[in-house]
């Protein structure tokens, strides 16, 4: 049952019954819950996956195909991020992708604090081969924990990201 509060209305010509009664927000939540989201780029269903499901999807790529397993930690935000990068280096991560460029911990570029930056940690360099299955699963768990649930498999040859989410 839905109740609508009676009150004075604003006279905005773009108002609808949904926006005036503020029921529009509830409909958005309702349709977001019952709907199935699809990626506008690939047309595939967007869903959360377990580590094992991500591993299974990884093995659908061609055998011997090479990937970087990437954990996005800063997504298009302003700042220098010196402390964050130093903390990741202290934890043992040596390779990064900063603003699309792969770099080593020894040659991190100086970031302009007034510009937006994207920083990804390259957690592992892997190839599609069953003998690496346990290592891949551990690396995926590590990547998920660093990035709040989103990881990329970056195809080194095609230079394309394949995005997976555990949320």
Language-model segments: which ranges?
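Conserved phosphate-binding elements of NTP-dependent enzyme cores
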Residues: 1-167
């Amino acid at each position: 049952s839905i109740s609508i509060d009676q009150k004075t209305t604003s006279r905005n010509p773009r108002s609808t019954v949904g926006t005036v009664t503020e029921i529009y927000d509830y409909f958005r939540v309702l349709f977001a819950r019952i709907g199935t989201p699809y990626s506008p780029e690939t047309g595939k269903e967007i869903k959360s996956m377990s580590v094992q499901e991500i591993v299974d999807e990884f093995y659908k790529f061609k055998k011997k195909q090479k990937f970087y397993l990437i954990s996005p930690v800063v997504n298009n935000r302003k700042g220098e991020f010196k402390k964050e990068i130093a903390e990741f280096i202290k934890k043992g991560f040596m390779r990064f992708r900063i603003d699309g460029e792969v770099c080593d911990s020894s040659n991190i570029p100086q970031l302009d604090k007034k510009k937006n930056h994207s920083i990804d940690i390259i957690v592992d360099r892997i190839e599609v081969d069953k003998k690496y299955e346990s290592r891949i699963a551990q690396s995926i768990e590590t990547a998920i924990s660093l990035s709040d649930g989103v990881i990329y498999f970056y195809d080194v040859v095609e230079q394309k990201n394949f995005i997976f989410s555990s949320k």
